[in-house]
C-alpha cells in the first residue's frame, strides 16, 4: 500500500466517523446543498412555472367575478381544470408579481418536499440505527431530483401539497379528531384523492362486519352474553370526516361561486380531455399508455376494462393490507396507502408524470423491504425503480402537442412513455401477492428490526403491537 493510499483511506475513515457522529448535521448540509443546486438548476433551465401562473389567473378570475371555466391563461391558452374551491384558495396569489410568485412557489414546494419526506418516514418503519431527522433531510435531498418532483416544481404544481395533506391524515394517531380533514380538503382541490375516502370506507365497513360476526359467534358459543360490538370504527370515522370536509368545500364553493360550481359539476368534471391530449407522453396512466399503443386518442372499452380490473384489484389489495397485522405483512399500512395511491394514478383519466410524487414513499418502502429481506431481487427492483423515476425517460421519445406525434410511436417509444404505468402494474402485482400470502399466514409475534418508533413505544414493537383484529383498527397511526 502506497503512502497516498494510506492517506486517502485515513481521510475516508475520518469522514465516515464524522458522519456517524453527526448524522443530522451532515444530512442538513447535504439537504441545503441539494436544494441550492436544485434552485440554481431550475433557474438555469429558465423554468416557466406555467401552472402556477394559471393558478394565479384563476384567483384573478374569481376576484373579478368572471367565468372561471371560460378563462384561458398564459400564451398556451391553458384552461382551469380544478374544482372552484381550488380557485378560491388561489386568490392570495394575485397580489404577487411573477418573479415573487415563482420564488414563493419554489420555496413552498421545497418545504413541502421535506414535509412529504417526514410523513413518508412516519408511515414506513426504519431501522433504529437511522436517526429520523437525518433520514428526513437525506430523503428530501435525494427525492427532489426525481422526475415527478422536478417537474412539479418546474410547472409550479400542487402535487406535493395534495400528497402532504393525504399523508398527514393517514399518519395521524387512531382516534385523532382531525384525521380525515386533510383528505377531504385534498379531494376538494383535486378529485383524485377521493379514492382514499372510498378505501377507508371499505376498510371500515369490512372491519365492522368482521367484528359483528365474531361477536355473534362468541355469543352463540356462550349461550348469550353482551350485545355485539358496534359497527363503528376508526376507519369509518376517518372516511366520514373526509367526506364531510369534502362536502363542506363543495358547499362553500357553491355559496361563493354558484355559477362556476354548477358548471363544474354538470359539465367540466366530465370533460376528461380538457387538461390536454390523452395520448401525450406526460400522461402516465392506463388510458395514456393504451392510447399510444392503439394509436388513438380514445381507447374506449379497452381503457374501461383495464381501469375496472386494476381499480378492483388495487382497492381490494389496499383494503386487505389495511386490515392485515404487521406480524403478517411488515409495513402493512404503508403497502395499503401506496397501493391506493398507485391505483388512483393508474385509473385516473389523466395522470401527468408530475402526479407521481408518490414515487418518494414508494421507493422508500421498496428500499426498506430490500434491506429487511436482503435478497438480490428486491435490491435490484428497488435500484431500478429509483433510477427509472430519476431518469426522465418519459420525455426521451418525440413529444409535441400541436402535431400529436405520440399517436405514431414505434414499440420502443411506447415502452419509454409507459415506464410509470409499468412500474405501477409491477407494484400492484407485488403488493397483491404479498397481501394474499400475508392473509393466509398464521399470526405470530412481530420480530422485524427495531424501528426508531420502537424506542418511543409507538412503533411495531411498542404499545400498538396488537392482535390482528385490534391492529387493523389503528389505520396508519404510528407516529
Locations of regions flagged by a protein language model:
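Primarily membrane-embedded glycan-assembly and transfer machineries that use lipid-linked glycans
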Residues: 2-178, 204-353, 409-412, 417, ...
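Alpha-helical transmembrane segments and their membrane-interface exit regions
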Residues: 166-170, 191-192, 271-273, 363-369
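Membrane-helix interface "capping/anchor" motifs
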Residues: 172-180, 371-378
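Membrane-interface alpha helices of multi-pass inner-membrane proteins
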Residues: 177-201, 340-347
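Central hydrophobic cores of alpha-helical transmembrane segments
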Residues: 183-186, 242-246, 338-342, 378-389
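Hydrophobic/aromatic-rich transmembrane helices and adjacent perimembrane loops
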Residues: 353-367, 423-424
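Aromatic-enriched
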Residues: 367-479
